[in-house]
Amino acid sequence: MVEKSSLEAAFSMKEPVIGLRFASEDLTDFITSESKFADCRFNDCVFDGAKIRECEFIGCSFSNCSFKEAEFFNCIFVDRETQAGSAWNYCDLNEAKFKACNLSNNRIVKCEAFLLEITDSSAVGLQFDAEVHRKISKRMMFGGVVLQRCKLQYAVFAASSYEESRFESCDLRDCSFVDSNLSRVSLMGSSLNNIDFTGATLDFANLSQATFDEMDLAAMASFKGMTVSRDQHENLLRSMGILTSG
């Protein structure tokens, strides 16, 4: 039996750790791999700079935890059978990195995510509500998030500023960015079919090489200076009810 006060010991167990609560544990710069947690709760734990590989966190919740500059590789945060995801509430994800992970149906709520990176991962149905910029004194430092080569179909991004973020080579079909600020965001090479940009601002956004059948420009708040590829012109004209002849 693992004492609930010993998270480091729990990571060393060969059998799954089920239904335990870990609070106020400090695993700064901790390195671990191949552990499995199910229905566990992590409160006020520190994982800053940790490197976590090939671990599973099934139906887990992280509340008020810090993951600054932590790295996750090939980790799973969703139940493969029920598709129930894990929850992240009021966590510090600043400069954290997730590579080749499964974050499908996860809920990221009221977190900080300045320069968060998610690459080569699945995050279908992700619910994302996080501050992606950093305020220093009275000055706002723009950072955004970086999501590249990710499956994000049906993801919902809460109305917020994602300015200067990069959503590149991602599957963004059926995603929602309603009422969000996407100024200077890069959507290069992503699939945008049925994406919801209602009320969103896409000023100087880059949609080059992105794929879409139609784009509801009228529903956007603004798209001044938006960049598209030449091969997208026909679809954009069709979206406005304009047909090309000759």
Listing of model-derived features with the role each one plays in the protein:
Residues 1-246:
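Tandem repeat scaffolds
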